[in-house]
Amino acid sequence: MAKDAIKLRAKVLEAYSMDDYLVELENKQQIKAKISGKMRVNRIRILPGDLVDVELSSYDLTKGRITYRHK
């Protein structure tokens, strides 16, 4: 997912658990996103309303991975 990933900015709408989130992309599309491994290891908290960077696979545009939380 590294080479052909699509990077977008999104806003977190809802937190389902510590790993699963509902995010809204810049084009108003809502997708499910999981937190990346580095963010999980470093225990970075993500709350509803946060702006995050999401990577989407070109194979499945309905699921993403949160890679960065903006301050």
Swiss-Prot record:
A Gene Ontology molecular function term of the record: ribosome binding
First-listed, main subcellular location of the protein, grouped into a coarse class: cytoplasm
Which Gene Ontology CC terms are recorded?
cytosol
* Protein name listed in UniProt: Translation initiation factor IF-1
The stretch of residues making up the signal peptide is none
Q: Which keywords fit this entry according to its UniProt record?
A: Cytoplasm, Initiation factor, Protein biosynthesis, RNA-binding, rRNA-binding
- Extract the CDD domains matched here: S1_IF1
